[in-house]
């Protein structure tokens, strides 16, 4: 049975066509908005109304299962996307040949013939949108809606939901939905980074949920630092693609929507995470009042 499942799974993801999913998402733009409204109700209304007079629910078992699932899910996503990103980065000629992009012979090779250019600007459906990598990039875009269940655990256990937590969940969910529909080339960077960071982050949450918080607590600032580094790289990717497309006027498969919203998101995340890191681990005044909150928040990329 396992062999049959494995064979069916391999056959499905190897023949996956992201275009069909993108068309469905394009035809259903109300889905992320409805999810967003319901999420805001969960964050802003439920704690002050439904849960105000209720005791916190004991969701430890469910929380353990949930974090274990997201850990394994993120590891699988990283397993498929990260090696492919590295391969495309180290062998840009393969991506350029498949993309069909015609380059000006006088253009600096540092700008438009490098691995960074090919992995951020030279989209080829056969590389990023279809097949096994395309399948996990698609799951990345879709997973941002169910990942908001993170917040439900906090709300129904009557734990605080800080602004960074729900702001990040909400904006990433909306961005991923519409950026996927627009087939932005830099999406592989975002998916690879997010899967990688989440593999570590949800593993931390899983161990904490199992009752071993003290064991992994020293890793909390490291996790937050890695998240900050993710935001730095994301900001660099967005700024680079903007420069290539609008300053140099070269071909780059990104949209103005993804450039503008991506820049606002990554810069705001960078500022908020940096502030959180400082208040949690560097500021003597706030260390006691915000104990290890940086790695406790259910956030992400």
Curated annotation (Swiss-Prot):
GO terms for biological process: fatty acid elongation; fatty acid elongation, monounsaturated fatty acid; fatty acid elongation, polyunsaturated fatty acid; fatty acid elongation, saturated fatty acid; long-chain fatty acid biosynthetic process; sphingolipid biosynthetic process; very long-chain fatty acid biosynthetic process. Keywords: Endoplasmic reticulum, Fatty acid biosynthesis, Fatty acid metabolism, Lipid biosynthesis, Lipid metabolism, Membrane, Transferase, Transmembrane, Transmembrane helix. The keyword Transmembrane helix applies. It holds the Pfam family ELO. Pathway: Lipid metabolism; fatty acid biosynthesis. The active site is at 168 (nucleophile). GO terms for molecular function: fatty acid elongase activity. One of its GO terms (cellular component) is endoplasmic reticulum. It comes from the Eukaryota. It is found in: Endoplasmic reticulum membrane. It catalyses: an acyl-CoA + malonyl-CoA + H(+) = a 3-oxoacyl-CoA + CO2 + CoA. The keyword Nucleus does not apply. Its EC number is 2.3.1.-. A motif (HxxHH motif) lies at residues 165-169. Disruption phenotype: Genetic disruption in bloodstream form parasites reduces fatty acid synthesis from C14- and C16-CoA primers. RNAi-mediated knockdown in tsetse fly procyclic form parasites results in reduced fatty acid synthesis. Belongs to the ELO family. Involved in the synthesis of fatty acids. Elongates C14 fatty acids to C18. This is Fatty acid elongase 3. It comes from Trypanosoma brucei brucei (strain 927/4 GUTat10.1).
